[in-house]
Amino acid sequence: MSGNPGSALQALSPTPPERGSFPLDHEGECTAQMMEYLNCMKLVRGENAPNCRLLARNYLKCRMDHRLMDRDEWAHLGLPDDKRAEAAASADSARPPRQ
């Protein structure tokens, strides 16, 4: 008796990871960018702040540059392009922090 039900031999074909899953940064190549982003999120108490989105963009760019994730357009990742990101960050930094 074989361990394969129905005695059918089927080759298992690997499937690519789902969109949004990517390799861990074992070498710590993007740790600094990640920590900047997480600290920003902590400061704004998890709100969707433009300056934090710019840091998220820097983190994802680092991951793409080090081939830890596939390159994609910023719009597909929910982030603004270069001009909009810089304008939003400069406008947000001019505002006083909320209490």
From Swiss-Prot:
Residues 1-13 have a biased composition (Polar residues). InterPro entries: COX19. GO terms for cellular component: mitochondrial intermembrane space. It comes from the Eukaryota. It is found in: Cytoplasm; Mitochondrion intermembrane space. Residues 27-70 form the CHCH domain. Coiled coil: none annotated. A motif (Cx9C motif 1) lies at residues 30-40. A motif (Cx9C motif 2) lies at residues 52-62. Disulfide bonds join 30-62, 40-52. Residues 1-26, 77-99 are annotated as: Disordered. Residues 87-99 have a biased composition (Low complexity). GO terms for biological process: mitochondrial cytochrome c oxidase assembly. Keywords: Cytoplasm, Disulfide bond, Mitochondrion. Residues 77-86 have a biased composition (Basic and acidic residues). Required for the assembly of mitochondrial cytochrome c oxidase. Belongs to the COX19 family. This is Cytochrome c oxidase assembly protein COX19.
